[in-house]
Amino acid sequence: MNQQHAPGGPGSTATWTSSAKDMVGTAIGQGRVWFTVGYGILNEVYWPSCSTPHIRDLGFIIAGDDFWSEVKRVNQYELTTPSSSLPIPKIVHHHERYRLELEIITDPARDVLLIRYHLEGEGLRLYPLLAPHIGGDGDDNYGSVSPHGLTAHKKGRHLILAAESGFNRASVGYVGSSDGWQDFSQNGYMSWEYQQAGPGNLAMMGELNRNSGVLALAFSDSAQGAATLAASSIAAGYQEARRQYAYLWAAWNETVNFPGLDKLPKNLSDAVRTSIAVIKTHEGRTFPGSLVASLSTPWGDTHKDAGGYHLVWPRDSVEVGFAMLACGLIAEVRALMAYLIAIQQPDGHWMQNNFTDGQPYWQGIQLDEVALPVLFAAKLHEQGLLGEMQGAAIRMARKALAFIAQYGPASPQDRWEENAGINPFTLSVSIAALVAGAKAGFLEEGDKQYALDLADDWNERLESWVYVKDTKLDRELGIDGHYVRLNPNSHSARFGDVMLRNRNNETISTRALLG
């Protein structure tokens, strides 16, 4: 059935994939594409920053005359990488009727993701199945079959899925009604060849001419640009892109200076190397120093969300910054410091989180996210790494410390983003920032003494605010006392209740709240 426009729009409600990722990856170079893998297939792919995904997933259907199978649902695969520090996933899907091998990289020179594929199985054909979510949104996408491949666009952003050997036929439809999976589910084979769909939640599918070859997923601000990038990447050759991908990662790994790494047991050293690579993969390029918390949307498989965890949290960024500092990644550390200075708000605080370009998303205020950048600046000052940023870092620290002094010790939100009050973690970080900023010489003499006095005062009162003794829990555990998670006021934590916003407003005694 070859029809021009697919029926059944706008399609079912758009969602993201699960956050249960197998791995993440990106090239080190001028290419601006990040990928995730989950359940053995390509999940969200981000471009031109690690804040913005443009597809939900790209999976595969394998079919013969009397048989069809979606590899994701079979869920029988193994994933390996060439080494613990080189994010090139090789995925092998096993089935009694077939063996499908995939390898995924991004082109270091272009905004293109490449998949090398090889299918073994008599009388079988391979069908890539792509769900575009242009601009981080599955709604209002437009798609079409073009001579160059499967294309999708929305609001001036375009992608194309092109095949080295081309497609024998292709179709674009609405998810849940006229997409390729529905075609196989209803008819047992590919019978639909819809040439256009949109606006809506789309899925696109094509039958590959060959069972071995290369797919290119390219992104651009124009349809022609995406097609050109895909074609040029395929023409330049997969092996050349892979060689450069591996070379650049190896060169970057040479800059890692983690004391004693080679003396650790192999399982521990591999874990460290993988962790360092994961950190690097979450780093932005258009906005150097930006570090998203996770290339995923934790609740995305149940509903759509524009932000997920692919956002910058100052808290997470500084904690990653200390890890990078421990690994001797000086360039990355300095870039992060400059980025934090740039996104600080005029009154001294940082937004709860933001996209990599600095645009705020959740706009709560958490005092630990105000204090941690000061601790980071103080550490860089101690190690002589601020350089020309010294003046800007001092101005940043002064504004942040003034904000802490004005609004502390209670935080408008605790670090779990539920409630206002005094939290042991936030309070301890705030006290440390006051002392570190003063000791680093970031403050004038009068302000320095005030910061130290305030830190002493909060430190002396910490136990009265967040420590309780001889509660039922303490007696059950045979301990003298414990620190509570949150005290909603400045009175003793032995009294009062907390209404937990992330537990359907359940009310619990302050002294019983842990975490």
Where are these regions (language model features)?
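Long, well-ordered core segments of solenoidal/helical folds
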Residues: 249, 278-287, 328-351, 392-413, ...
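Extended ligand-binding clefts on enzyme/binding-domain cores
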Residues: 138, 154-182, 262-271, 366, ...
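Structural helix-adjacent loops and short alpha-helical linkers that scaffold large soluble proteins
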Residues: 260-269, 286-289, 324-337, 380-398, ...
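Aromatic-rich carbohydrate-recognition surfaces in CAZymes
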Residues: 120-121, 141-144, 151-156, 160, ...
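C-terminal capping/lid segments that line or modulate ligand- or cofactor-binding pockets
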Residues: 2-53, 312, 320, 363-383, ...
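Acidic/polar, glycine-enriched structural segments that form the non-catalytic walls/loops
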Residues: 1-8, 96-100, 107-308
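Solvent-exposed loop and edge beta-strand segments that line ligand/cofactor-binding
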Residues: 24, 28, 255-265, 298-317, ...
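An extended acidic
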Residues: 4-90, 162-184, 251-260, 264-265
